Amino acid sequence: MRSAEKAVPLTSAYSVVCLLPQAQFNNFRSCAQGNVFHSLLCLGAQRKGMVISMLNNKGFDLWADGYDKTVGISDEENTYPFAGYKKVLGLIFQTIMGVENAVVLDIGFGTGTLTTKLYERGCSIYGQDFSSRMIALASEKMPNAQLYQGDFSKGLVEPLRSFRYDYIVATYSLHHLTDAQKKSFLSDLRGYLKENGKIIIGDVAFETREALEQCKWKAGDAWDPDEIYFVVEELRKDFPALSFTQMSDCAGVLMLG
């Protein structure tokens, strides 16, 4: 074990696990199937002699109340997977604010951290998320937003297909899709953009495969092998106009018109 390199992510992961009350943690374990926090939780759980697999939608529901705090820990410590999270959201927010009263679709909006700020500034918000609990939390902040539950690996839910959007955003959500699914979904989403509209993705993302491998090595056991992160040079083969801004060593913003 590389003590210096693994101590920080292991400590971070353990602190994340400790945020969850024991009763919820036990429920969490019983329904675990798939989540962006998988590697963090597994590391922390190993210290307790526990095993956690990926979360299903029930797992997302259980984790919803601690979502923002969990992300904040990783961002503040500048560690994978959420290093640069605030910078990512800040760039997306500034971009969308360039269009007055923009119509925005958020794919996997979570607790509404980004979309709430847009909503408060006059944007019309539409969204799709896997978790009913996430939707409930976001709806409290945005009572007039049009939010729907659905698995975006199967595409947009029917009500959202009736509209056209200035911006379609996805923050830390599309890495659950395979590369082939990403390409298909992005191609489909372009059909729902208004003229001059943009798809904006903020996520764990890298310009090259080499950069991804470097981040993977640095993250050590914290790296989640079940997530499929963006490699821009490979995605540009299908989307030559794709632009990319690196925001940290593991996060970036992709834009596609």
Task: Tell what function each PLM region has.
Residues 101-108:
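Conserved class I S-adenosyl-L-methionine
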Residues 172-176:
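Short catalytic micro-motifs in class I SAM-dependent methyltransferases
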Residues 183-195:
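A short glycine-rich, Lys/Arg-flanked "PGG" loop and its adjoining helix->strand segment in the class I
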Residues 2-9:
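Extreme N-terminal basic, low-complexity initiation segments
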Residues 169:
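A conserved beta-strand element that flanks and buttresses the S-adenosyl-L-methionine
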Residues 14-16, 25-26, 34, 40, ...:
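Short terminal hydrophobic/aromatic SLiMs and anchors at protein ends
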Residues 30, 41, 50-96, 111-159, ...:
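Class I (Rossmann-like) S-adenosyl-L-methionine-dependent methyltransferase catalytic domain
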